[in-house]
Amino acid sequence: MAFIIAVDGPAASGKGTVASRLAKLYDYPMLDTGLLYRAVGVRLLDADGDPDDPVAAEVSARELDISELERPEVRTRAAGEAASRVAVHPGVRAALFDLQRDFALREPGCVIDGRDIGTVIAPEAPAKLYVSASPEVRADRRWKQLLGQGESVTLDEVLADIRKRDERDGGRASAPMTQAPDAVLLDTSEMTIEQAFDAARRIVETARARWGNPKG
């Protein structure tokens, strides 16, 4: 059985950084599932499609090539907004499920980050983290990231985006963003990157010890 590390949480919570650091530590492959939805959104935007159209979004998801995750466009603010809109469609989530599930079953283990990994994609994951932070802190992080990418946007605009995405991600009927009952909450609001990673490492090490000795 693969040792799956599921890292869930809202946008700009620090989950991607935590996940990538954990993957490097354990030498596990990593999948950022948010990029899948961003890539689907970018496909639609490139074709002048509507991310709110469930049929067009599902077609885009089924035609997605994994290489498209490497496009710089998937890291933009527009891609993030489109991703949140296409992710509400059950057909899109179904189209991408097998790809994510197959990745989760890789031996000896893997790291997957997203919104529904511990609840839908890999509910059996031995290590589950729910990484979060206040909307204001997350908005400040994302704003600085976008400025570094050359995008022109205000902090207030980014905060509005964050709040809108939280509402959409948490309120969708299909696989809403929520903390799994057995996930450990990691609030990074007042943590540095190193502090967040160290806390995450301890959580995973505890899970690994329990996984290796289930009766312990």
UniProtKB/Swiss-Prot annotation:
It is an enzyme of class 2 (transferase). It catalyses: CMP + ATP = CDP + ADP; dCMP + ATP = dCDP + ADP. It holds the Pfam family Cytidylate_kin. GO terms for molecular function: ATP binding; CMP kinase activity; dCMP kinase activity. One of its GO terms (cellular component) is cytoplasm. Its main location: cytoplasm. Keywords: ATP-binding, Cytoplasm, Kinase, Nucleotide-binding, Transferase. It comes from the Bacteria. GO terms for biological process: pyrimidine nucleotide metabolic process. ATP binds at residues 9-17. It is found in: Cytoplasm. Its EC number is 2.7.4.25. NCBIfam families: cmk. Belongs to the cytidylate kinase family. Type 1 subfamily. This is Cytidylate kinase. It comes from Caulobacter sp. (strain K31). The lineage of its organism: Bacteria, Pseudomonadati, Pseudomonadota, Alphaproteobacteria, Caulobacterales.
